[in-house]
UniProtKB/Swiss-Prot annotation:
Homodimer. The tRNA molecule binds across the dimer. It catalyses: tRNA(Ser) + L-serine + ATP = L-seryl-tRNA(Ser) + AMP + diphosphate + H(+); tRNA(Sec) + L-serine + ATP = L-seryl-tRNA(Sec) + AMP + diphosphate + H(+). It comes from Rhodopseudomonas palustris (strain HaA2). Keywords: Aminoacyl-tRNA synthetase, ATP-binding, Cytoplasm, Ligase, Nucleotide-binding, Protein biosynthesis. This is Serine--tRNA ligase. Catalyzes the attachment of serine to tRNA(Ser). Is also able to aminoacylate tRNA(Sec) with serine, to form the misacylated tRNA L-seryl-tRNA(Sec), which will be further converted into selenocysteinyl-tRNA(Sec). Pathway: Aminoacyl-tRNA biosynthesis; selenocysteinyl-tRNA(Sec) biosynthesis; L-seryl-tRNA(Sec) from L-serine and tRNA(Sec): step 1/1. The lineage of its organism: Bacteria, Pseudomonadati, Pseudomonadota, Alphaproteobacteria, Hyphomicrobiales.
Length: 476
């Protein structure tokens, strides 16, 4: 969320940064919404002030036994009492319109972020290691996993449909080992505090980290059947104005049938009992400081969690339809930092190095890309993507994203009202950062494809062998 005062004070600078994302200037329209809001507030405050003054004048008139003036003032107060709800409603409407507009526009890129329209504008920052040489043609992880009898997409489809997998035996254990290894390094060496957060969160948590409202269709939501039906009945009843004809049994019955037939898109209805399945532990971890004022002596605060993550991937039809690259459910180790504004730049570099370190210890070749303005995430000011080499992808292998490390400035903090208090005692918004440390499922793919052997077995990286009971090779 952006500061409307900063936009008012320097609209040209705001638009200059905003248009670097390939978007049209927007400062003028935001300022107009703010002017409407401020005018509505002024009218409401003037009416309230006049009502207060008139009420006092009534007492003075009565003391002076000026009944005519007292009657006129009472009539004025009565009229103000009638008109004020409309003025207050206008304030609320204008305020919500501005907040809605601000909530739907992305963060501004830092000046150092390279300009570009899409992923082709990303810049190769640095690389680690080299591609492995094989005396055979490397296979894809799904071919290897299915041949081992440890990766079952058909069984998953029977249970849950497409984009799910059942892992068994050695590969199930290997995935667990990877997650535990990542956590141990981040907590034992990198100073992160392990958290076991909720996987189901409410609307305001998703809004705080900016998954809502823009990316609603990419998320899974859950609500009880009772609440769903009640909400639809209330929604339809209100829409049909059935309250004015409560005896209209036919109308009420229609609403009930509509709820049962699931004919209403209720995703935008007010549903306080709805939950969202987290698309990343960033949501749960970052919202731990929502509506808080932290002591800056406690910052930076570093948190990590190993959780399942859930994504509908509504915009991914036809992409990565085979294998585990793009799943509705996957496991990920998340890194979150809460910092002061002065700390966030250095913390971003530190977070990247923490994510890199676990991949280095697995002996995986990767490259780090600085995302351009047209490819960075909605809430990000600057993002590094780590792309790991997967020799079984496509023709001759491919780099695939395994981690994104982003600094968000105070963009999320404003949405969450997360602040800190420094030595001067004045509260200010914190800065938030998040990164994958890393995606466990994709790390599993990278290990399978990079450590495959000609007979189809998988060598276990040295760093993971203690987590595998000393097992060195996963074989059929």
């Amino acid at each position: 969320m952006h500061d409307i005062k900063a936009i008012r004070d320097n609209p040209q600078a705001f638009d200059a940064a905003f248009t670097r994302r390939g978007l049209a200037p927007i400062a003028d329209s935001l300022i107009k919404l703010d002017e409407t809001r401020r005018a509505a507030i002024l009218e409401s405050e003037k009416a309230q002030a006049r009502r207060n003054a008139a009420s006092k004048e009534i007492g003075d008139a009565k003391k002076a036994k000026d009944n005519a003036r007292a009657d006129a003032l009472m009539a004025e107060v009565a009229e103000l009492k009638t008109t004020m709800p409309a003025l207050e409603a206008a304030v609320k409407e204008a305020d919500e319109a501005l907040k809605k507009a601000l909530s739907e526009i992305p963060n501004l890129p830092l000046d150092e972020v390279p300009e570009g329209a899409d992923e082709h504008g990303n810049v190769d920052h640095h690389r680690f290691g080299a591609k492995r040489d094989y005396a055979f043609t490397p296979k894809a992880h799904y071919d290897l996993g299915e041949a081992l009898g440890m990766m079952d997409f058909e069984a998953a489809a029977k249970i849950s449909g497409a984009r799910f997998v059942v892992l068994k035996k050695g590969l199930a254990r290997l995935e667990r080992a990877i997650g535990q290894f990542f956590l141990d390094v981040h907590t034992g060496e990198h100073g992160y505090t392990e958290v076991n957060p909720p996987l189901l969160v409410r609307d305001d948590a998703m809004f705080g980290t900016a998954q809502l409202p823009k990316f609603r269709e990419d998320q899974f939501q859950t609500v009880t059947e009772e609440v769903r039906r009640r909400t639809i009945v209330e929604f339809v009843s209100s829409a049909m104005k059935l309250g004015a004809s409560a005896t209209d049994a036919g109308g009420s019955e229609f609403a009930r049938q509509l709820a049962n037939e699931e004919l209403v898109d209720f995703s935008y209805a007010k549903m306080p009992e709805r939950f969202w399945l987290i698309p990343t532990a960033e949501v749960s971890l970052t919202n731990l400081v929502r509506e808080s004022i932290l002591d800056e002596k406690e910052l930076p605060m570093r948190l990590t969690a190993l959780t399942p993550c859930f994504r509908a991937e509504a915009g991914a039809a036809g992409r990565d339809t085979r294998g585990m690259i793009r799943q509705h459910q996957f496991t990920k180790v998340e890194l979150v930092s809460i910092t002061t504004p002065e700390q966030s730049k250095d913390e971003h570099e530190r977070m990247l190095s923490c994510a890199e370190e676990v991949l280095r210890r697995l002996g995986l070749h990767y490259r780090v890309m600085t995302l351009c303005t047209g490819d960075m995430g909605f809430a990000s000011q600057k993002t590094y993507d780590i792309e790991v080499w997967m020799p079984g992808q496509g023709e001759g292998g491919a780099y695939r994203e395994i981690s994104s490390c982003s600094v968000c400035g105070d963009f999320q903090a404003r949405r969450m009202d997360a602040r800190s208090r420094g030595p001067d005692g004045k509260p200010r918004f914190v800065h938030t950062l998040n990164g994958s440390g890393t995606a466990v499922g994709r790390a599993l793919i990278a290990v399978i494809e990079n450590y495959q052997q000609e007979d189809g077995s998988i060598a276990v990286p040295d760093a993971l062998q203690p987590y595998m009971g000393g097992l060195k090779v996963i074989a059929k």
